[in-house]
């Protein structure tokens, strides 16, 4: 007899915050959401793997997920949880703290795996940071998202986004007011696209290199979803943030287009 799947119920606080995020994104830009998540996955267990291009990303993703009726628990940097007011709200909303570069990262992964296995949708940035790729394409990822999928047994849905970098600069809060004012005036198009689940069933978690191969597939899938969101910007973004550094050590070698 199959055990029925339980689903995490998002706190009212987080549902209200998602509505507020949708309103804020609508004030600062024009949100366009494409693609979707299958009905049987919408409420979990599920891993959403998203490219990271701006400090404004969490707000954009909260809004886009609200449009699609999804209430994800976000794996977020420990800095947010240490903030006096925001930290308390993050904890009460059920989000998961990640202190990068510390031993507690493994504990965060275990917490996230338990959350997914318990019926949650968990949103993770496989790159592990705001990407510094010269063309703003997804970087070579960390293996956390793949290991989370292996540990929980949940499917991974790639999510691509484009446009949030035109709202908040890389070094926010430095330059934040200027960026927000520019966004209110220009109202850039902010696009989010949900893709089809990534095929990982043929990979065995115990096989050497499996997590790295799975990570490559996840990043490839995010890249595939990002391509149609920036058709006129295949090599370099039109909007260039002068405060955003460039780094080539983690450039992801994308597979040739089919």
Language model features by range: what are they?
Residues 115-146:
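Catalytic-site beta-strand/loop segments enriched in glycine and acidic/polar residues
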């Amino acid at each position: 007899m199959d055990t029925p799947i339980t689903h995490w119920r998002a706190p009212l606080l987080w549902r209200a915050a998602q509505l507020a995020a949708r309103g804020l994104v609508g004030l600062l830009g024009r949100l366009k959401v494409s693609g979707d998540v299958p009905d049987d996955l919408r409420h979990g267990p599920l891993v959403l793997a998203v490219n990271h291009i701006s400090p404004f990303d969490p707000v954009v993703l909260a809004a886009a997920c609200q449009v699609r009726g999804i209430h994800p628990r976000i794996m977020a940097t420990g800095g947010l949880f240490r903030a006096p007011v925001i930290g308390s709200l993050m904890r009460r909303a059920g989000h998961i703290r990640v202190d990068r570069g510390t031993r507690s990262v493994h504990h965060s992964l275990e917490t996230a795996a338990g959350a997914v296995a318990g019926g949650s949708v968990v949103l993770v940035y496989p790159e592990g940071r705001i990407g510094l790729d010269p063309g703003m394409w997804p970087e070579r990822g960390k293996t956390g998202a793949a290991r989370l999928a292996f540990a929980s047994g949940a499917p991974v849905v790639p999510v691509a986004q484009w446009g949030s970098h035109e709202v908040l600069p890389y070094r926010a809060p430095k330059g934040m007011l200027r960026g927000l004012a520019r966004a209110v005036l220009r109202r850039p198009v902010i696009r989010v696209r949900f893709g089809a689940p990534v095929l990982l069933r043929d990979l065995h978690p115990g096989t050497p290199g499996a997590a790295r191969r799975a990570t490559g597939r996840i990043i490839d899938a995010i890249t595939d979803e990002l391509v149609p969101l920036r058709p006129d910007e295949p090599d370099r973004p039109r909007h260039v943030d002068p405060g955003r550094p460039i780094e080539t050590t983690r450039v992801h070698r994308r597979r040739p287009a089919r």
